[in-house]
Amino acid sequence: METRTFLMTSSYYPPYHFGGDAVHVKYLSEELVKLGHEVHVMFSIDGFKYKKPDFNGSLENNEKRNGVDLYPLQSPLGKSDLYFTYLTGRSSYIKSRFSGLLKEIKPDVVHHHNIFFLGYNVLKKYGKYANLYTAHDYWLICQRFDLMKYGQNNCEHKNCFYCTLLSKRFPQIWRNSKSFMEVLGDIDTIIAPSNFMKDKLSESLPIKPNIVNIPNFVPRLPEDIRDSNYSNYFLYVGVLERHKGICNLVKIFKEIGMGIDAKLIIVGTGSLKKKIEEYITKNKLENKVFVMGWVSNDMLWSLYKDALALVMPSIWHENNPIAALEAISTGLPVIGTNNGGLGEIIEKIDRELIIKEDGLKGVITNFKKPYSKNKIKQVYDQFYSFEGFLRDYMKLIGDVQT
């Protein structure tokens, strides 16, 4: 197979990250390296410090991890550069670093991911490379990135200016600029991990770029997954934020905890972590609901393996969440709402596991149907394996470059 040089751009990169989008970048980069490709990743350590103020570390300007060349962005202006990038959509520091990397490594493919900390200027095409963008969230069409109107409900009728103000953010005037429109036109292809995302972008983008649906993937399981030492539990994996529906899930265990013959284990952290822990203590749920925070990869696989089901009670329009794919790869069923592209995943197992927000209580209470782990793993093999992703990804690159 022909080998190529890739440059990935991303706001985050593990372990300096918070969500599944950065995990996807890591998975993709490392799998490409295993195949003999050369992969470089440019990401914002300033952005990570902004979201995690207690982080005091620093990184080298270039370091190699698992065969991937990493370029952490650390502006001399620190947070000020982030604010300027947010307000203007561009950063001279980031543009300079990006241009320098293009000249140095001469990539065949530049693949952009979540770039809200980098600015839209990196989308501009400066050479003959394939210029790709994966829409991990709704940043291209929504200043909040999540299509949550006023941060409360899914946006059905746009009122971006007032939504921005009520969300306590400054309006990004550059979104209506000619330069932003021109840069969008420089993207060769937008990868939408869900059909829902593809449809939303097609409806809302001011230009009509080429958009293809290629679902995310997760690597194959480790050969030996240990026992978690937990049993009879539902599992939640994700950030602890309102839009993920985690508060609704914990509330169900408070209201009918004795009617649910299982525990709830919560893996993840976020702004609601302390509030959830206080709620558990206040309502004496310590023997029913457990908040584990972030855990090691080995422990996470063990928890997937031993759980009854992964529960994803999302309020917002999910895209193609990595946690759901990880669960399926272990043979674990997924219970979740039909918001966004989440239902596209769950229906491949059983449509009865797709629930409305007010139906979550009934599904969890009555969850007794046995599911074949092997059949669920077949869903992974068919739709969410790296082999399937690679086939579509390389075909896309070949089409762009011809």
Task: Describe the function of each predicted region.
Residues S329, P333-G336:
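Short hydrophobic beta-strand element within catalytic cores of glycosyltransferases
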Residues L7, I191, R226-K244, V250-F253, ...:
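Conserved donor-binding/catalytic core segment of Leloir-type glycosyltransferases
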Residues F196, F217:
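Carbohydrate-associated surface elements
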